[in-house]
């Protein structure tokens, strides 16, 4: 990968000049000038996903200049480097190959001269065999009963991805009840175990190192709870499996290493749902549906890897994001799925984006002089409309939004879905085109109210519009289309990281807090006052000790 400061490129300078022209351009003008604007600024993936980016403050010239930026930053070269197994995660000296986990073509993928695909396929086969035994009831607990509940214990990428996908694909789930425990707060594991029976519960301990503090604290509490009923430590092997690479620690815990599902250091946590970390997904929806999830992602990988920039959906979305982040000065992006099953999608990509591109040091080790990753947030529609859309419509912040919805609902009750979708379509129209003072006055007149006497209210009913959105319409949320959608966002994040000239696949920002917590933990014992920190931290710790 080439290290290029984007602000030193000719394309960046051209974009700054172009922004001076575009900053006050209104979308309603762009639409009136081009009746076929939708056709120009939309793309369809595999007859499954329509991406409409026409409601953005862009012209073809904008996209051309953004694509010139991608070319100067050698995004195409970076894509080749990632897919070919080069160690592009330089600070950890690792390849970045979550794409190999879903490589349905089985073409060789080389890391250090070795094809990783045989190992990938072996773990997938192991997941298939194990999941079929559990789902069928062949796998028995210590009293001979079949498993009814599965508890995934992990944190970060070992939790967010599997939880998001199992929720998004609930229409495909089987009889097993899934639970996810992540927080080291004892409430999380305690409340989960209240719903479970030790005779019929299977625990998945998801930790690459098997030393993650939060995960292992919860795992030991789960084991204690289990043994309080089962008594015999030998029974742990029937109720606990490991998603890990540390066989020594797994064995010490009491898990049979035959029930350890491996993954590799070239799989980043926030990109790991495609690996053994996805075992909870397989147990929830079955292996065939998991394969469809992989296939959808693989299809998007192929699109991303082989499609020219002007038709490359992740590339287009990434460049539009940079346009707002680095030229309009927006600080956040909202992800707004109009599908209740997708209620964890924004949280998943909050980690996916912010942990990947929340960096202020570039690939040369220098502090950047430009904005990098945006703040990501969002909630399902229509709930958000009655919560925070007020600020999106009439606030002083410009917030680009992704609206996501399926054309076909898994629950076609009465006219629920039509009402949901009418809101989906209405919101992007309202954000783009707004409502003028003239329209407000006309509404007063048609309601028999005198606009002159109602004038004091009128300013509050005006919507400026010109708020940018992408509309992402799926035919239906299936394992295949969800896989493609997730991969689309993953590659968008990657492209932005390349252009920002940062390392997208490490996460050193999580380390300092963990180190300090390990130092503070022993200080919380006993009653003696603590004075080894700053005055704020000392007094917070001492008040905690006094009150507990």
UniProtKB/Swiss-Prot annotation:
GO biological process: gluconeogenesis; glucose 6-phosphate metabolic process; glycolytic process
Transmembrane segments: none
Pathway terms, separated by semicolons: Carbohydrate biosynthesis; gluconeogenesis; Carbohydrate degradation; glycolysis; D-glyceraldehyde 3-phosphate and glycerone phosphate from D-glucose: step 2/4
Gene Ontology terms: cellular component: cytosol
Keywords from the UniProt entry: Cytoplasm, Gluconeogenesis, Glycolysis, Isomerase
Pfam families attached to this UniProt entry: PGI
Protein name: Glucose-6-phosphate isomerase
Protein source organism: Proteus mirabilis (strain HI4320)
């Amino acid at each position: 990968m080439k290290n290029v400061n984007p602000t030193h490129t000719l394309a960046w300078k051209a974009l700054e000049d172009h922004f001076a022209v575009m900053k006050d351009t209104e979308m309603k003008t762009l639409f009136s000038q081009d009746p076929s604007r939708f056709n120009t600024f939309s793309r369809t993936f595999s007859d499954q996903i329509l991406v409409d980016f026409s409601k953005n403050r862009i012209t073809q010239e904008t996209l051309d200049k953004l694509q010139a930026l991608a070319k100067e930053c050698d995004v195409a070269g970076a894509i080749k480097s990632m897919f070919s197994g080069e160690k592009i995660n330089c600070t950890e000296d690792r390849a970045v190959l979550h794409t190999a986990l879903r490589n349905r073509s089985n073409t060789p993928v080389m890391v250090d001269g070795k094809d990783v695909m045989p190992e990938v396929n072996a773990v997938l086969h192991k997941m298939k065999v194990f999941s079929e035994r559990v789902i069928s009831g062949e796998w028995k607990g210590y009293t001979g009963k079949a498993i009814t509940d599965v508890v995934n214990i992990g944190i970060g990428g070992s939790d967010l991805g599997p939880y998001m996908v199992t929720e998004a694909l609930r229409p495909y789930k089987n009889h097993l009840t899934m639970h996810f425990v992540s927080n080291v707060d004892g409430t999380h594991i305690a409340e989960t175990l209240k719903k479970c029976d030790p005779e019929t519960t299977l625990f998945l301990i998801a930790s690459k190192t098997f030393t993650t503090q939060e995960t292992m604290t919860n795992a030991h509490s789960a084991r204690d709870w289990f043994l309080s009923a089962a008594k015999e430590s030998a029974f742990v092997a029937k109720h606990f499996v490991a998603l890990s690479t540390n066989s020594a620690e797994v064995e010490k815990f009491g898990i049979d290493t035959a029930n350890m599902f491996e993954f590799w250091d070239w799989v980043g946590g926030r990109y790991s749902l495609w690996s053994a970390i996805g075992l909870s997904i397989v147990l929830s929806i079955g292996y065939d549906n998991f394969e469809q999830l992989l296939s959808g992602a693989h299809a998007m990988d192929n699109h991303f890897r082989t499609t020219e920039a002007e038709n490359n959906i992740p590339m287009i979305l990434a460049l539009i994001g940079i346009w707002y982040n680095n030229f309009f000065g927006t600080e956040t992006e909202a992800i707004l799925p109009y599908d209740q099953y997708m209620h964890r999608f924004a949280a998943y990509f909050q980690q996916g984006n912010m942990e990947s591109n929340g960096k202020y040091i570039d690939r040369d080790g220098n502090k950047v002089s430009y904005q990098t990753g945006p703040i990501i947030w969002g909630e399902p529609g229509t709930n958000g409309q009655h919560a925070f859309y007020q600020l999106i419509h009439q606030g002083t912040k410009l917030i680009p939004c992704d609206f996501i919805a399926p054309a076909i609902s898994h629950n076609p009750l009465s006219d629920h879905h039509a009402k949901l979708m009418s809101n989906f379509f209405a919101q992007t129209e309202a954000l783009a085109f707004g409502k003028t003072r003239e329209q407000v006055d006309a509404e007063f007149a048609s309601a028999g109210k005198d606009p002159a006497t109602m004038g004091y209210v009128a300013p509050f009913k005006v919507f400026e519009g010109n708020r940018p959105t992408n509309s992402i319409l799926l035919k239906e949320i299936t394992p295949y289309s969800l896989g493609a959608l997730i991969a689309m966002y993953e590659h968008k994040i990657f492209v932005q990281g390349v252009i920002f000239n940062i390392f997208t696949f490490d996460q050193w920002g999580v380390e300092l807090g963990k180190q300090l917590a390990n130092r503070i933990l022993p200080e919380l014992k006993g009653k003696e006052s603590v004075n080894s920190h700053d005055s704020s931290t000392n007094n917070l710790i001492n008040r905690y000790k006094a009150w507990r």
